[in-house]
Amino acid sequence: INKPDVNIQNQKVSFGTSGHRGCSTKSSFNEDHILAITQALCEYRKNAGITGVMHIGIDTHALSTPAQITALQVFLANEVQCKIAAKNSYTPTPVMSFTIIESNKNSKDLNDGVIITPSHNPPCDGGFKYNTPNGGPSDTDVTSVIEKRANEILKDGLKDVKFIAKENIYESKFLEVADFITPYVKALDTIIDMNIIKNANLHIGV
């Protein structure tokens, strides 16, 4: 298993647009990164008073599903209430943003989310992006804190990481499964004027 060397810049945790991206074969995105980032995120949430649900979505990149498992090991060990998509289905980024916003409308606790995706990066890459309670991507004032702490955790050999065994994930009282897609699709009709599109006589080739 490739292990990151924190003395090599491109193997450290490095947040770009709200998240860390990298490649497992280049030691820039592997289990150690996910363990460190997730623990750092748990600590950030606690310090920021974010005590609600952590929504977690994945995309179709090969590294996304195993990264979600690792993240859940840490979130659940830290007693963070988590929601994942039913049947491990995929969650587009706009769906995650919508889900976070809707969940905060009638909640006394702040809810946020993670999208495990490297976006448009190559198939071999993985990514881990954090969306704050406003539904949008986290800004540098947030990511800089998480990045710094994650690299400290890596440098210290992951000693501060709390995690549960993989086989105990789905037995945890802190884990729920949910349908993220259906509420989003149903809401589209209230946001987009479908009749204008219908009457525009557009011809689209796919």
Label for each model-derived stretch:
Residues 1-32, 36, 152-156:
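Cofactor-/ligand-binding subdomain signature composed of acidic, glycine-rich
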